[in-house]
């Protein structure tokens, strides 16, 4: 390119050689492309503005048409140059035409401009050819299509002088020729001295170059044509293969569909069979479920009442929890407001500090400029100041670290403040519950001390912040860094707060799950209570049936009395089988009351005939009445025979007792009396195999000395006052209780033997005592108040004989007892705790020594009273029985009915109290669980706070503050106090549970008390 400026030097190198050498050097150095672009730009500028050369520039070709057509033609040319690989001309064309690569028109746009119909064959062939042959440009394909179109139409019938060439205004070749001519005019003409050889060589090269270009174009055209043919053939082959593949695929799909349809039919049949089986099973299960539902509906009706009460308690607890949550939210809002005020204060202080720093920085910069202008000698001084500034920077970094530590301490103080606020809230609630003013004052003093310490620490932190702000002497960029660090710390605090909230939510979920578990437990307890109530109802029905049978039996026996039964009973006690040996007669038989009581119990129980299926037969009282009447009439003869022996034995026994009054045991002092009472108790309790009730335990575990003294004195006075006019009629009831077995039924088991003994004693003692005090001519009982005070509780039991000692005493006492029992029920449960341990110890020692076990089913005075009353009745006044009238029998029956009604009312009252106490226990358990959960939450919160404080301590190199130590001491004290309170509460609740467990067992005990008296007959 630059060889035209160089003079011809035949001595050194020719033009061609120099051109080749320059080309090679530029190419090796990698400067060829840049040099070509520079030369192109220069050429274009010189052609456009040939100012330096004095020649006139050729006139520019005016292009007619719109800008859109010009852009379309330019895009056609650019596309053609790009497709053909004419990079040089393309690089020249883009800047000359003002066209950008992004603004080139697409083929669809060009066809739309030319207004070729999209449905025409030309449009379709151009688009298909462009898609297939991306190497060719739009211009080449368009010209090819036009040539083929016009070649097909060259043969015409009429000869016309028309050319098939496409007319155009100016071709590209003409433009290039004009450019070459202008370029040639710009350069100086070659010298005429050039040889013809050089010209010929140049022409040859040009011709060869043109031939090569033409050959290349022809080869490209030939290749493209062959490639299109091959592509068409391959496309046809692929279409055939695709059609075959589609057919095969459709066949396989049809076969698969048929197989699937058959499988579906089989599966549907199986499913139908399975559904039929399931429907049958479901129907059977449905019937079972309907039966269960019918049972459960009955339970639901009972459970609704308990659920309502539970919902009321739950609502109260929810209201308490809501109030606590509102208080916590208010405190959180207060804390947020305090934090906002602190943040605003910090921001204002930082702004003030920034302004001060800016002012200081401006003044210092001015001073430094003045000092630099004045003297160059102060450079050394400035260097020293730089060292000082560096040291200050280090101090600043240290202060920043210290600030971070202080902020961490602030966070810990805030967390501690939150914990302290929660503790204050809990302490306030405890103070409301306990109303301990001394503890309140102490806690207030402690909290005030804590607040003072917190305020002091906050003031110290503020002072430290102010000191650090005074120390900082750095330009604003460092302040920006410091603000970023503050923002990071605030974000970290927010993340920690979020973690704390998530943990709190998890703990609340645990609380809800535990509450649900407690609700399930309550439902189970309610079901258990319902089953217990059903059993109690059944037991009450059985009791009523048994009482009816007893009343019928007594009425039948009263109609057919036998007068000599009381004498037969007294004679039987000292007859051949029951009397002690000669060894015992020599040494006072009454001094061994335990053995005496054992012998009496064995004698009486050997004659107790059992009746089978009393519980089942009690459902029909008329049939029972007929059966018992027939059996009693048949056995009266046997009773008359044994009555004579009993009378003889009783008379001899009473004579020996009156002859030896000094050796008779006193129940207040002598331990054998206690042993005799314990013997009968152990027999009755072991025979019935049931737990001892709490009220019986109260009676049996009172101090026996005072009780036995009072009752024996009262009974002796009552007997002495009523001896004169005592009726003889009372022997009928003793005959009822002491009717013997026939000989065929005397070989019974030990269990029936002992059960009959217990029932015999209670039924025989109560009518005797009733007859002792029921005579109308007898003087009024001298000490009814003392007897009522000595035994207020046993009147509520079916086994107690003291309330049935006399009718007049009972009528006077019941009015006072019914009033006092309602208030004494809670007191008696507390007396159990007082009297139980010492008396149990004494009983176990005595009974283990004699091989017996304690039982609280009978009061200890029954046996002594029964023996004394039977003694007095049978010995002194044997003729008073015949003067008894039928009216007194009816009155006694009415009194028995009244007693039974009162006992039922008392039992109902006891059951209600037991239900209330159970509910109290359940509430106590729920409160205990809630407190345990709150304590666990407190412990977890405290552990988290301690962990955070320990982490902060590990990060900071400082020692523990006095405030933290003080807080730890307070927390330890609170934990110890909480542990002590929880242990006390758990101990109280355990004692209450121990107290109330016998009351739960009492529900089953009355069932035995009224079911088994029929065994006497």
From Swiss-Prot:
Changing residue 137 to S: Induces centriole elongation. Reduced ciliogenesis. One of its GO terms (molecular function) is alpha-tubulin binding. Its main location: cytoplasm. The keyword Phosphoprotein applies. Residues 69-101 form the LisH domain. It holds the Pfam family LisH_2. Residues 657-676, 685-705, 721-749, 769-801, 897-1017 are annotated as: Disordered. Phosphorylated. Phosphorylation at Ser-737, by the cAMP-dependent protein kinase PKA, triggers ubiquitination and proteasomal degradation of OFD1. Also increases its interaction with TBC1D31 and regulates its function in ciliogenesis. Ubiquitinated by PJA2, upon phosphorylation at Ser-737 by PKA, leads to the proteasomal degradation of OFD1. It is found in: Cytoplasm, Cytoskeleton, Microtubule organizing center, Centrosome, Centriole; Cytoplasm, Cytoskeleton, Microtubule organizing center, Centrosome, Centriolar satellite; Cytoplasm, Cytoskeleton, Cilium basal body; Nucleus. It comes from the Eukaryota. Homooligomer. Interacts with LCA5. Interacts with RUVBL1; the interaction is direct and may mediate interaction with the NuA4 histone acetyltransferase complex. Interacts with SDCCAG8; the interaction is direct. Interacts with MAP1LC3B. Interacts with C2CD3; OFD1 may act as a negative regulator of C2CD3. Forms a complex with KIAA0753/OFIP and CEP20/FOR20; the interaction with CEP20 is detected only in the presence of KIAA0753. Interacts with PCM1; this interaction may be mediated by KIAA0753/OFIP. Interacts with TBC1D31; regulates OFD1 activity in cilium assembly. PANTHER family: OFD1 CENTRIOLE AND CENTRIOLAR SATELLITE PROTEIN, ORAL-FACIAL-DIGITAL SYNDROME 1 PROTEIN HOMOLOG. This is Centriole and centriolar satellite protein OFD1. The gene is Ofd1.
């Amino acid at each position: 390119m630059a060889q035209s400026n160089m003079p011809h030097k035949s001595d050194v190198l020719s033009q061609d050689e120099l051109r080749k050498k320059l080309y090679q050097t530029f190419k090796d150095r990698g400067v060829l492309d840049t040099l070509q672009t520079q030369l192109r730009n220069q050429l274009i500028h010189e052609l456009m503005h040939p100012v330096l050369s004095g020649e006139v520039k050729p006139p520019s070709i005016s292009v007619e048409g719109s800008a859109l057509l010009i852009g379309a033609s330019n895009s056609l040319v650019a596309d053609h140059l790009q497709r053909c690989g004419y990079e040089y001309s393309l690089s020249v064309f883009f800047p000359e035409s003002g066209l950008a690569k992004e603004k080139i028109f697409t083929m669809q746009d060009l066809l739309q401009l030319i207004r070729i119909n999209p449905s025409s064959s030309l449009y379709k062939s151009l688009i298909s050819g462009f898609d297939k042959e991306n190497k060719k440009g739009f211009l080449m394909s368009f010209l090819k299509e036009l040539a083929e179109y016009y070649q097909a139409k060259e043969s015409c019938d009429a000869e016309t002088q028309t050319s098939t060439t496409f007319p155009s205004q100016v071709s590209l070749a003409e433009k290039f020729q004009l450019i070459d001519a202008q370029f040639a005019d710009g350069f100086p003409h070659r010298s005429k001295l050039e040889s013809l050889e050089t010209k010929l060589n140049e022409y040859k090269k040009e011709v060869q170059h043109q031939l090569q270009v033409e050959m290349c174009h022809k080869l490209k055209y030939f290749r493209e044509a062959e490639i299109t043919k091959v592509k068409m053939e391959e496309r046809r082959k692929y279409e055939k293969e695709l059609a075959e593949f589609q057919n095969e695929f459709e066949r396989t799909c049809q076969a698969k569909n048929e197989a699937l349809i058959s499988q579906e039919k089989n599966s549907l049949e199986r499913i139908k069979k399975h559904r039929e089986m399931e429907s049958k099973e479901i129907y059977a299960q449905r019937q079972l479920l309907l039966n269960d539902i019918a049972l459960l509906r009955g339970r639901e009706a009972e459970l609704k009442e308990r659920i309502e009460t539970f919902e009321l308690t739950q609502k109260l607890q929810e209201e308490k929890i809501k109030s606590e949550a509102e208080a916590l939210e208010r405190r959180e809002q207060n804390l947020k407001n305090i934090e906002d005020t602190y943040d605003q204060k910090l921001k204002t202080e930082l702004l003030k500090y920034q302004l001060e720093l800016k002012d200081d920085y401006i003044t210092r910069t001015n001073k430094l400029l003045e000092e630099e202008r004045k003297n160059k000698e102060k450079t050394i001084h400035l260097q020293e100041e730089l060292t000082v500034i560096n040291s200050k920077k280090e101090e600043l970094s240290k202060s920043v670290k210290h600030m971070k530590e202080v902020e961490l301490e602030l966070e810990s103080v805030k967390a501690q403040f939150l914990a302290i606020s929660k503790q204050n809230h809990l302490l306030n609630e405890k103070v409301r519950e306990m109303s301990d003013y001394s503890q309140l004052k102490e806690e207030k003093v402690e909290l005030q001390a804590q607040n003072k310490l917190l305020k002091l620490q906050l003031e110290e932190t503020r002072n430290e912040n102010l000191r650090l702000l005074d120390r900082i002497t750095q330009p604003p960029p460092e302040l920006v860094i410091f603000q970023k660090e503050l923002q990071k710390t605030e974000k970290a605090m927010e993340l920690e707060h979020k973690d704390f909230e998530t943990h709190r939510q998890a703990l609340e979920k645990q609380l809800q799950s535990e509450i649900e578990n407690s609700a399930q437990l309550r439902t189970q307890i309610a079901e258990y209570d319902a089953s217990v109530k059903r059993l109690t109802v059944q037991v009450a029905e059985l009791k009523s049936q048994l009482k009816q049978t007893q009343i019928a039996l007594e009425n039948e026996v009263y109609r057919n009395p036998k007068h000599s039964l009381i004498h037969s009973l007294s004679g039987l006690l000292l007859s051949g089988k029951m009397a002690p040996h000669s060894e015992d007669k020599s040494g006072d038989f009454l001094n061994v009351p335990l053995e005496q009581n054992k012998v009496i119990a064995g004698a009486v129980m050997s004659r107790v005939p059992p009746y089978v299926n009393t519980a089942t037969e009690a459902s029909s009282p008329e049939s029972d009445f007929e059966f018992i009447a027939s059996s009693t009439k048949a056995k009266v003869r046997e009773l008359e025979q044994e009555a004579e022996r009993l009378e003889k034995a009783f008379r001899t026994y009473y004579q020996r007792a009156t002859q030896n009054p000094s050796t008779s045991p006193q129940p207040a002092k002598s331990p054998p009396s206690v042993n005799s009472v314990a013997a009968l108790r152990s027999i009755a309790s072991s025979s019935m195999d049931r737990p001892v009730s709490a009220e019986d335990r109260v009676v049996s575990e009172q101090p026996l000395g005072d009780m036995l003294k009072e009752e024996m004195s009262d009974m002796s006075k009552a007997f002495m006052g009523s001896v004169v006019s005592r009726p003889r009629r009372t022997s009928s009831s003793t005959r009822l209780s002491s009717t013997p077995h026939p000989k065929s039924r005397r070989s019974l088991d030990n269990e029936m033997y002992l059960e009959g003994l217990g029932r015999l004693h209670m039924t025989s003692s109560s009518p005797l005592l009733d007859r002792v005090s029921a005579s109308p001519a007898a003087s009024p009982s001298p000490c009814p108040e003392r007897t009522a005070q000595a035994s207020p509780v046993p009147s509520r039991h079916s086994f107690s004989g003291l309330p049935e000692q006399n009718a007049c005493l009972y009528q006077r006492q019941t009015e006072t007892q019914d009033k006092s029992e309602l208030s004494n029920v809670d007191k008696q449960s507390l007396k159990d705790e007082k009297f139980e341990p010492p008396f149990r110890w004494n009983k176990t020692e005595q009974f283990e020594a004699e091989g017996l076990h304690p039982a609280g089913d009978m009061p200890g005075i029954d046996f002594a009273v029964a023996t004394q009353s039977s003694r007095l009745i049978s010995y002194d006044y044997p003729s008073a029985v015949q003067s008894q009238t039928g009216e007194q029998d009816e009155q006694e029956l009415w009194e028995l009915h009244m007693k039974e009604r009162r006992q039922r009312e008392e039992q109902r009252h006891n059951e209600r109290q037991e239900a209330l106490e159970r509910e109290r226990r359940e509430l106590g358990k729920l409160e205990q669980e809630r407190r345990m959960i709150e304590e666990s939450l407190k412990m977890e919160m405290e552990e988290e706070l301690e962990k955070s404080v320990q982490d902060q301590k590990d990060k900071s190199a400082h020692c523990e503050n006095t405030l933290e130590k003080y807080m730890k001491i307070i927390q330890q004290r609170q934990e110890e106090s909480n542990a002590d309170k929880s242990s006390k509460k758990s101990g109280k609740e355990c004692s209450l549970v121990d107290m109330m467990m016998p009351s739960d067992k009492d529900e089953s005990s009355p069932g035995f008390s009224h079911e088994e008296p029929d065994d006497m007959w």
